[in-house]
Amino acid sequence: MDKTARPRGPTLVPRRQAGVALILLALAAPSVLAAQQQWLNSPIGDGDRPVFPFFEGWYDNGDGTYTISFGYLNRNTRQVIEIPHGDRNHIEPAEFNGAQPTYFLASRNRGVFAVTIPTDRRDEDIWWYLTDEEGNEYKVPGRARSPAYELDWYPRPHGSLPPLVWFQSESEAGKGPEGVWADATLTTRVGQAIELSVSTRDESVRDPADPRFREMIPVRVVWSKYQGPAGELTYGRPGSPSQETTTGDSGPGAEVISLPDARGTARVLATFHAPGEYVMRAQADNWSGPDSTSGDQCCWSNAYVRVRVSQ
């Protein structure tokens, strides 16, 4: 799978309103809607609840390819769940397997990864399977067909757009669920802190006459483990005048940084306690804006970096 993302142009079809989307979705794919709605209504708890895979929607990239966005729902409010790749966590067709997370933060997390398919495979379903410790299997198909699921890159009512994210050069920036992958694999040792950094810029254009926008809408960056051996990481800060610590609402397992100027580099120190191959994810969003929310599938971007940890 090619994990190198690039900024996409706008889709050709306007975004549907939520109510209309639900009606169309019920007509177009009742089984998918019923399953995901049932999962949303399932009991929540502090621990020992399942994780459900979610199909968020699809993008027409305008170049003959389609990007399918996936997220998940961890019904635990305070417990991170880890499900390694394998029989309990896999994607079919197998060529797309490995893109999905193994580390599941609490609650609803939308658009954590995406896969891109060509036009001649548009009729295929991309299935994501998760199985809990009791052997219960949960699966969802990603498909780039139903108009009710089509997503877009148009500015929201007050101008919000997904922030750009990059590791080396802004010319290589990505955005949205597909985001961007770092070319280089970082290396460190168990117990030795390593700096993780990602740059971002919010390109939203908002009305300066609106009092809500007299000050910049900050970009929030959430660093978390995405894949890797079981176990938690320890986070610290290298110290940077361009970023602020925020408490956020991401729950355990994540480190949250605010960039008050809506651009800059978000840095954290990560210490790994087990050797192995890891992927770290940085989510950049502007959700403090009045028209930006994950529930509207806007406006955030993903950035991923591989880390190899030796003993």
Name each region found by the language model.
Residues 31-35:
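Sec/Tat signal peptide C-region and signal peptidase I cleavage site
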Residues 112-116:
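Ligand-binding face of N-terminal immunoglobulin V-set domains in extracellular IgSF glycoproteins
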